[in-house]
Amino acid sequence: MSTAELAVSYAALILADDGIEVSADKIQTILGAAKVQEVEPIWATIFAKALEGKDIKEILTNVGSAGPATAGAPAAAGAAAPAEEKKEEKEEEKEESDEDMGFGLFD
């Protein structure tokens, strides 16, 4: 993440923390007050449009809650076990076929 993106992100978080609607003008105002000069105005517009109508505090509090994804993990592990058993059976069959051809070292 570039310095410009980081500065605009922090400005948006400051606005959300104060309960102020996030807009490009308000982001630019905060960046000006912080004396951040290297940010192009397009970044403020992009972030303002991306966050328009969204509750930033709710997004931040729900970042770590991935309940359904963790519930599906044991099912995937159970499905992998039969596949491993099939591979072992095939390997055993190949070993037996080598013995039938008389290529054993100690026959």
UniProtKB/Swiss-Prot annotation:
Keyword tags: Allergen, Cytoplasm, Ribonucleoprotein, Ribosomal protein
One GO MF term attached to the UniProt entry: protein kinase activator activity
Stretches with biased composition (Low complexity): 68-82
Biased composition (Acidic residues): 90-101
Matches recorded under InterPro entries: P1/P2_N_sf, Ribosomal_P1/P2
Region (Disordered): 68-107
Gene3D superfamilies xrefs: 1.10.10.1410
Protein family membership: Belongs to the eukaryotic ribosomal protein P1/P2 family.
Functional note: Plays an important role in the elongation step of protein synthesis.
Assembly notes: P1 and P2 exist as dimers at the large ribosomal subunit.
Protein name: Large ribosomal subunit protein P1
